[in-house]
Amino acid sequence: MATSIPTNNPLHTETSSQKNYGFALTSLTLLFFMWGFITCLNDILIPHLKNVFQLNYTQSMLIQFCFFGAYFIVSLPAGQLVKRISYKRGIVVGLIVAAIGCALFIPAASYRVYALFLGALFVLASGVTILQVAANPYVTILGKPETAASRLTLTQAFNSLGTTVAPVFGAVLILSAATDATVNAEADAVRFPYLLLALAFTVLAIIFAILKPPDVQEDEPALSDKKEGSAWQYRHLVLGAIGIFVYVGAEVSVGSFLVNFLSDPTVAGLSETDAAHHVAYFWGGAMVGRFIGSAAMRYIDDGKALAFNAFVAIILLFITVATTGHIAMWSVLAIGLFNSIMFPTIFSLALHGLGSHTSQGSGILCLAIVGGAIVPLIQGALADAIGIHLAFLMPIICYAYIAFYGLIGSKS
């Protein structure tokens, strides 16, 4: 397989060829689980707060805009912060900020002001952004460069596990706790789960501060001896940022429309409850695919694997648009399986050979996650104009670009 980060990459840990980084990777895997969990918990928070504050759909979607807006605003400063204080300290800072964000849900519930919930969510998402900027590249250098994409894919598999578990957690601790008819009780339902999350983030921050996982050295030349300038001078990074933008946009778009799509009488005609249960196959497929990919991609070219999965996703979307019934239903749900390796592979390919610019490059890539807020809006406009069925043509454009990046754009 193609090496995502070359053997002469200036990013390295002390005696990296001799050390076993299993415990450090295990700790990092917990972080991936946590931010996947937090992100998917928004799917429960949106309908819950919509009912509490009697919001319309546009107002309730401010939850997602605040979350992804944090990526857009915080990513680049986070990259500079991580470069200045190290990956490990960046992780600790991210955990503390995320813990503060979770804790802010308690006064937000007490005062029952929607804007306070949005502010708390923004702080929480800012912490998650710092974690992503620090942890993603950290995983790529904890071990052999040749298996960087494989390691990142494995940790992303646990991110998918978090997205699978979060709705169950939210349904039990938020929605079931809000069965009381009063608004006060419904608002208070978020206190306990977010208090638990604040404590979890705090414990993880203490663990990372005490255990002191190996620090990364960034003291050798980057690719092509580009010691000056910035990460923006690397073509494959810029194209990779576009890849992250369209990938996250496509994933969020498909996932966001699944319940309505599967409830459509011309597709599966499921009730919304049954449709929601079927959505688990979409996220579960991503989780399974990442576990498989973490092993398989040790032996497969990263770019070719990315392009193959993108082409299959395109085929599945064409089938989704062209058919109805169970064929359309299972075609769109199967996309989750082929989404599995895309984010970690694009991320790893884009950071190839950035050397001392890697932390800044990671910030740029995390900045591109704002695609999760923009692409769904475009698909939503299409759904209003031409119907939800034909609106699934939009993600095809995204996956076509991802295929291009895997075959051509990722070449440095």
Swiss-Prot record:
Compartments, record wording: Cell inner membrane
Domain of life assignment: Bacteria
Principal subcellular localisation of the protein: membrane
Gene Ontology terms: cellular component: plasma membrane
Membrane-traversing stretches: 21-41, 62-82, 90-110, 113-133, 158-178, 192-212, 239-259, 310-330, 331-351, 363-383, 388-408
Keyword tags: Cell inner membrane, Cell membrane, Membrane, Sugar transport, Transmembrane, Transmembrane helix, Transport
GO molecular function per UniProt: D-glucose transmembrane transporter activity; galactose transmembrane transporter activity
Membrane topology: Multi-pass membrane protein
GO terms (BP aspect): D-glucose transmembrane transport
UniProt cross-references to Pfam families, sorted A to Z: MFS_1
Family of the protein in this entry: Belongs to the major facilitator superfamily. FHS transporter (TC 2.A.1.7) family.
NCBIfam families: gluP
Function, as annotated: Intake of glucose and galactose.
Protein name, per record: Glucose/galactose transporter
Gene responsible for this protein: gluP
